[in-house]
């Protein structure tokens, strides 16, 4: 990705009443980043959030003295966030403290084997050698290959708009040369023979809603991204970043409206002219940016507009990411042996993922990601206590699972598994608890099929094949977030806002819809 090309707006310009109006639907990371970038370019910005607090998937839950991040817990490529502060003439470090976490995470396999992923090349090499000495040469080659993929697929193309076929054709030779037609697991298997190591180096697509056995090998870049930029935690939780971004928008002169549910994007002569809220209020806009779920945007917010490409039928047939069961809980004692980021894997890998993504059946076995933020940030729990967040990938709602009856039995199985592996005695010390299931993702976040990461990142749902950042259906409508290019994850959704710099017209060149 190239350096910044957008200059900060001089403070004297932020209150001009005749600036062109940009309305952003949704206040997830993508929407907040888009709002800041539009404000920096001279737009008057309004952000509309249907819920009572900003953040979207990055909202915050507080109960019984504990603070839980609802969604993202890992910050990689922090420079993408730092750019937003730079655009406003500020330093991110003055508002948010990022703490580097290394090792990144600890992977516990079903047989008790532990693998520590780290930025330290020699330490990582030693981890590989400890598990399978014969795979060390393959590890060294894979590290070099991961870097090459990163430099093309993320550094060069991650913030480039892919709404033109010509862009895809120019990129295709490099992407094919790097094995983009293969899957992540197939790519990793070229370098590692040991199945434990194949799992350790191929699971990353799950962090963005993908199946390692179907996700394009471009996503082998994630490992290099982590090593290059580090894995970080925001002190106070990811919600501290959300709060900082909201302050930037307000300091630019922008507005965040909560409990403002958008019912329809209004269109005249093929151009977006504003929005109609659920209560009937109409808001005029020169451009509209949707950070809502991309399928929801097209099927619900543009239901009154005839669409050529992203029709209801096409979106119904698209492949969506898996769902998640997320259990937040607090304990009245600390579990000092539990690392901040821990993967607790079950007995199956490929078979489990086939059940989740393709067969769409809920199975007795599962794998979990356990987050213990209070390991480094005791402010998130009362004294002597610990805050936890554990999630398990599950089929999305296309499975027909009734989570109103399945949620509690599933939570109990998660608790039992934690007690058997890394948290003995857990059941005796839980003092607060809450859950999210795919039904919550559907009903609260308006995510189609309750998918946790919108569209699944398969080859033919990536880059040009993904819904574009500039809408093909309506002039003046732009998309950011997990369902558009480049995809899910904090770096992906923040980069989707970066793409807008190249596709949103300069406000001075835009014919007025509203003042």
Regions of interest found by a model, annotated:
Residues 13-151:
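N-terminal glycine-rich phosphate/pyrophosphate-binding loop and immediately adjacent elements
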Residues 1-23, 40-41, 458-465, 471, ...:
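Extreme N-terminal leader/targeting segments of oxidoreductases
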Residues 332-442:
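C-terminal segments that line or cap access tunnels to active or ligand-binding sites in enzymes
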Residues 221-278:
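Helical element adjacent to the flavin cofactor pocket in flavoenzyme catalytic cores
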Residues 72, 482-505:
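A conserved FAD-binding loop/helix module that cradles the flavin
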Residues 108-214:
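Rossmann-like flavin
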Residues 2, 263-382:
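Mid-domain catalytic core of redox enzymes
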Residues 194-208, 363-371, 424-486:
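A glycine-rich dinucleotide-binding beta-alpha-beta segment and adjacent secondary-structure elements
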